[in-house]
């Protein structure tokens, strides 16, 4: 295709120069509208039809779905447009200026994962898209780094059903077919304050929390014993007590105590089943101390995800790469996209650089990724190879 678009490096540069931070703090949170419009302009130049979708209950966030070709099936290439916030004091260069140094491209979002869109657009230069017999979709989502609101909303409302989807998170071009889910809850105990000289006149929230943690530790052991998937390095669900706060003085009965905890379930352990287990575990404390214990989700839970190893689409990717699909413990948008079609997580860059100061992608990924993008489109969208 003879299309006038910026060079690959210039595509990358403009993506990195367009801030799109997601944060729970409204002061830090940013709209991704400018980045969505940038992508829309490039993709329209390539002949895609563009749909921009406001994502409800967000601070000015949008999804973009770009479609080229018609018919059924096809390929969906997905990525999120947002980045995490950055610690200015720990970066040695401007996070919004693409910096090439010693074979690496530095900048916020170079690996995780705005750069993925540059790879897609650059690969399309060499493909005769007039020969597509199955559609090519490109999805750019919002708020993956916080609530995953964009992917949730898209999956719940779209009518498209591709044959296959790739989410371009940084996996070092290693195909990922499964990951654990994530639930994060606040356990809050409301006691009754009083002078420590007469403990019977108060209700010590720290003691009730100790009782609660004892029950939760029992649940942790049950999960470890009951659920096992040897495909994972850590083959059982994990539970972590990550934050606790309570009390204000040694001579005062603690009135309030709060614990933040998370659970990472294996695929197949549903969020509802896990929520039921959690409340069942804490039921004895609630029964003994009515009205004093509450459980509140810190964010919308993310289910575990798994693409069957024997799916024919997985075999195509494994053959292209010469590598077997693996599992990881971190979370992506895959559970939501998997509801539409078989999905793998596969992209350039290393997860080790994600969310780090001086984030970078090694330039050694450029040619293999560009080649892979072309192969994916040929295999799933072009006449002679579309399945």
UniProtKB/Swiss-Prot annotation:
Catalyzed chemical reaction(s): N(2)-acetyl-L-ornithine + H2O = L-ornithine + acetate
Record carries keyword Amino-acid biosynthesis: yes
Positions with a binding annotation for Zn(2+) 1: 80, 112, 169
Protein name, UniProt field: Acetylornithine deacetylase
Protein family membership: Belongs to the peptidase M20A family. ArgE subfamily.
Catalytic residues, chain numbering: 82, 144
Domain of life where this protein originates: Bacteria
Oligomeric form and interacting partners: Homodimer.
Keywords of this entry: Amino-acid biosynthesis, Arginine biosynthesis, Cobalt, Cytoplasm, Hydrolase, Metal-binding, Zinc
Keyword Zinc included in the entry's annotation: yes
Organism for this UniProt entry: Proteus mirabilis (strain HI4320)
Binding site for Zn(2+) 2: 112, 145, 355
Metabolic or biological pathway: Amino-acid biosynthesis; L-arginine biosynthesis; L-ornithine from N(2)-acetyl-L-ornithine (linear): step 1/1
